Each structure stands twice: as structure tokens, then as C-alpha cells.
Amino acid sequence: MGERISITTPDGNFDAYVARPAQSPAAAVVVIQEIFGVNQVMRDITDGLAGQGYLAICPDLFWRVEPGVDITDQSEAEWKKAFALMNAFGVDQGVKDIQATIDTIRQDPGCNGKVGAVGFCLGGQLAFLTATRTDADAAVAYYGVGIENRLGEAEGLSRPLMMHIAEEDKFVPKEAQAVIRQALDGKANVQIHTYPGRDHAFARPGGEHYDAADAQAAGERSLAFFQTHLG
């Protein structure tokens, strides 16, 4: 269903997976990867957004470390590689690459000019930073790891942001969740949804903590949010 395009930066080019909707022009959504690269899960999410009428694009944000990463969460060796990639990844440069992705897809003939973003895990933190640092029109963060360390940027949060937090997330402990809520609750442009009993990556199909009902609930909330802010 998808295609590959190249995105140009001052440091070089990187690939992105693109899925196009049946009708265009349409609003675009940048899908921000987990620590497993642009794998089948990310491509399926991208395809699914296209099926909902969005021009969806998933950039290879690990390209500066290792281009073309496509691994799963199904083996210890893959987990070790994923964490090594995450540790080598530069978040600040990654946000700049997201802005380059936004610029590229916004200029695509199939885009109507509106661009949102949705990110998962590491991508959840990047989605938060997309809302504070880029000109994306809206962003959704699923179980973002490390956001509690980035809350100094909350003052610059001018874009609509939705967050999905797993109450039992082993990577985002309750203390971190409390800090996030203290900083962001009450902001008119922020919506936070907490999922009781859920662990990290509850919306990752095939994952250890996947929960179909809450994944569907979060997905429906995200789509409604995009419909509101992207049209």
C-alpha cells in the first residue's frame, strides 16, 4: 500500500514510508516510530491512518545511527539492539528531522497544508517535543518515555496535544506521571487520558501488554482529536 520517499536535510537524506488516502488533497499525519524502527507495526499504523483519509508518513528517524532499522519486540536480541539504538539516538536532531518531514509532506501535492503527528514510546516523547518545537498543527503522544524530563518546554506548548498514559507503565512510573500532570493539567490545549491497569505499549498489536479495548479507545480518541484540529 505504501511508498518510499526521500527527505532532504543539510546533513543528508533519509527515507520515509508514505501511505496515501483514497481522496486528496488531505491532511497529513507524521507517524513517529518506537525504538524498533520503521517496522511492520509502524507501517500498519501509517496504512491505517491512510485508510481513515489522512496522508500518512513514517520517517526513518534512526537513519543517523543506522538506516533502515526494521526489528520487532519478539526476541531478547532485538530488544538489546533497540535499546542500543535509542541510547545512540539524538533527540534534538530527531525533532529537527521531524520538522523536515513536516516540511516535505506539507509541500506534497496530496497534502492540504495541515499536518499532525502521532508518536509511540520514544516517539511519544518526540510527539511532545513536536508540539513544543515544530509547526505541526497537532500532536498525539502514546506512553511517551522521558517527557517528565522535558517539561521545561511546556511553557512553549502552543500546539494542541493529546497524551495517552498507561497507569502501570514500567518506563513511566507513577511519580513521573504525577509530575507530567502537575505541569500540563489545566492547559487549554492539552488533553491527557490515563488507562488504568495498562502497561507500556498497550496499543502495540502483538506486544506483551497489548489490550485491544483500550487500544481501540485510544485510537478513537486520537482520530477525533485529529478530526477536530486537522479537519
What do the predicted segments below correspond to?
Residues M1-G231:
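N-terminal cap/leader regions of alpha/beta-hydrolase-fold enzymes
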